[in-house]
Amino acid sequence: MVNTVTFRDFEERDIDFIYKCKNDEKLNSMVVGNFHPFTYEEAEKWVRGCMGEHETYKFWAVCTNDEERRIIGWVSLSNIDRINRCVCHHGIVIGDNDYRDGTAMFEAMIFTMEYAFNSLNLHRLYGSCLSGHKVSPHMLNALGFNLEGVQRDAVCRNEKYYDILNYAMLEEEYHSIVETGDLDIEKLIMRFVSSIKKSKVITNH
């Protein structure tokens, strides 16, 4: 299967897109952090802060896989700890509706997993998501992440409380998944759909 997206450093031309996404309350409704609308100046500062190499974090623009390489979202790693060899998967945002229901999020996760375990040679990759997110818990399950803990009723959205689900993967688990070919996109989608079906069965009971 041909990748639908590619990855690059942030550029000045991405500011308008970031400004739009950072002010889209619906897009940000199911992220762990609280919604904070951006001024255009804040969007400029944010993009420039994401550019280049940094000791403790790394951001990539998720782009169309063509000559234009137009930004459609972003993905990042934070809290890079080279002593304890661990890193936080800070999240994925796909702001372009045309790519939100495709494989872009899986491709972005595979890319950052490879970067964390192979390029940075780290031991542990961890992250979190809200229990009410329609995609993230099932995607992390499909990718082979382990649920390590639940912070109950930790975030309030529209007068409803959601748990924060904490996930992690170790380097030996990642390499085992790679060796068995379980990061194949088609296999991931099958496990993703299966996870959704199981959650619906549990909810209905």
Model-based region annotation:
Residues 26-48:
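Conserved GNAT-fold acetyl-CoA-binding loop/helix
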Residues 12, 37-41, 56:
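Generic alpha-helical scaffold signal
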